[in-house]
Amino acid sequence: MMKQFWIGYWFKPWYFLYRIGYAIVISGIRGYFKNHQYDGKENIPANTGVLYAVNHQNAFLDPIVIAGRTKEPTHFLARADIFKKPMVAKILSMIYMLPIYRQRDGVDTIKMNQKTFDTCFDILKNKGNVIIFPEGNHNYKKSLRPLKKGVSRIALGAAEKYNYDIDVKIVVLGLDYENHFKMNGSLYLNAGTPIDVSEYYENHKKNPSETINNLSDRIYHTLSSLIINIKDDENYDELYYLLHRVPFENNSNKVSLKFKLRKERLEKIEKLEKTNASLYEEIVSFMSELKITMKKFKLRPYLLHQKPNSLLSLFLYSLLLILFSPFHIIGLTTNYLPYKTPVWFVNSKVKDKHFHSSLKMALGSLFFYLYWFIITIIFSQFFGWKYGILFFITLPLIAAFNYKYWIYFIKVRGLWNYKLNYKSILSLRVKYLNYYATIK
């Protein structure tokens, strides 16, 4: 991927704007997410038309993280209202976005969308890629909503247009974000085995509606198996906390393993809801209590698995923070503004939180490179260009150190808080360990 990023893709026959955007996305993914993993990419077929059917949790971030992991330009459908201005429509077409109309747009949706569908048919015939979010809208919740039939209609519509002499595959792709709205979480892309649309050609000729429904059902069940699907919406926040904050016995940082453990825990708690509803309600209620208490004392549940550290060890940990604080201050001068400026801007100007991550990632990439370029020029004026180049090379290393220092600071602060408030949360710890035996 890095070789392709720095050399190969610049020479591809893509729109220049798309190549610039691709560079930003590749850099952004590596900087914005602490860990990212793409499983099943060997399932992506080559030399054929591919329709990606993807769950939709994060507005514009969903398509760009997929586009950033593909070797060819990927088209995706977007709300038609953002195409209203001709200049904007031109720019959007240069990054391979296609308009999809809804009834609220006040147009003949069948007629207008048919143009987009015809374009998709041609893209698939020419062995291109199209991303579709069959849920129809975005929602940060890790719950699969009912699917629209657009994926099936486009796949089988392309077949019908070309007299069923076309090779089309549907790749069902699950996206999972550890944290939808903040950086340094993990990103997991999970591709299933491709669905060969030709399996449905004969039935589609005889009964189009039934075939579209059958294919859509298959997509739904496949997608559900590839994501975290919390069905209890009433207790969603508590279940999310249980899956993402309560630690596992296997404390691996591997993204795919964490995803697997979360799915297994969710299946266990869903089974408990059916077999022991009263215990299920107790655990859900306790998760609410746990979340409030942890927030109050600025703690994480993993601390409840251990007794407080000794004062000597806490002083030694704190001494390390003091010793390395000068390097942290240097890191703040070279990284704080480009890190915080996009956060301040997006949080204050963008109301829909579903767009926050994509904007923070894109703006953060631009701001970091711009800020580093400016301070390198200033540094070079005082110390010369040789040292200026060396300074620029060290900036990413300083940023990495600063991030590690901040994480270490948070952990040490948590250890101190746990030590100082242990008596206040002792009864909660006992309850937690009792429930953990059921949910671990």
State what each model feature region is:
Residues 1-16, 293-319:
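Compositionally biased, charge-rich terminal segments
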Residues 1-2, 100, 191, 220-223:
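Intrinsic structural disorder
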Residues 4, 247, 258, 431-438:
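Intrinsic disorder/low-structure terminal segments
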Residues 11-25, 30-210, 328-440:
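Soluble catalytic domains of membrane acyltransferases
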Residues 16, 87, 119, 199, ...:
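Exposed alpha-helical structural elements
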Residues 210, 217, 221-303:
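Long, charge-rich alpha-helical interaction segments
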Residues 300, 307-348:
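Core alpha-helical transmembrane segments of integral membrane proteins
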